[in-house]
């Protein structure tokens, strides 16, 4: 609670220091962010399309890793944390393993990771989109299921990356409308 009060004070002070009519670079990029989001999601989908077939062909499992409960977390009060944790999960656990499965896809997986890092950076700069601290149970379930699948977990997680992009889109659409 104290950290949110401190954050509010810092935001207020920053706003007071900025001259009228001139927004800070961060404010300007946050104002443009909702308009840039469809382009960022399209870029993620385009890069993913280059590796989608590879991972979906290797995914021989019938279960779903990214379940409806994760989407519900994205849409609920834990949306911010669920999104943040899932981005971190893909960047730190899934993609480093995915890069090592075939030299032909390494560059594309790396590019996908860079696009995801850019999205995360923009979300963090615009605090209204990613102001969170709580843990998501649905994300924990995804991580546990991923771990249990061992090597097959990479194929499963990467083959469902398009679902993850859809969940990001649902979360951001909800945030933009609020």
From Swiss-Prot:
Superkingdom, taxonomy of origin: Eukaryota
GO MF assignments: cytokine activity
Residues spanning the signal sequence: 1-18
Cysteines engaged in disulfide bonds, as pairs: 30-126, 80-132
Entry-linked Pfam families: IL10
Main location: secreted
GO-annotated cellular components: extracellular space
Biological process annotations from GO: immune response; negative regulation of B cell proliferation; negative regulation of cytokine production involved in immune response; negative regulation of inflammatory response; negative regulation of interleukin-6 production; negative regulation of membrane protein ectodomain proteolysis; positive regulation of B cell apoptotic process; positive regulation of cytokine production
Location(s) in or outside the cell: Secreted
Keyword terms, alphabetized: Cytokine, Disulfide bond, Glycoprotein, Secreted, Signal
Sugar-bearing residue positions: 134
Protein role: Major immune regulatory cytokine that acts on many cells of the immune system where it has profound anti-inflammatory functions, limiting excessive tissue disruption caused by inflammation. Mechanistically, IL10 binds to its heterotetrameric receptor comprising IL10RA and IL10RB leading to JAK1 and STAT2-mediated phosphorylation of STAT3. In turn, STAT3 translocates to the nucleus where it drives expression of anti-inflammatory mediators.
Oligomeric and partner information: Homodimer. Interacts with IL10RA and IL10RB.
Family: Belongs to the IL-10 family.
Entry protein name: Interleukin-10
Species of the source: Cercocebus atys (Sooty mangabey)
Name of encoding gene: IL10
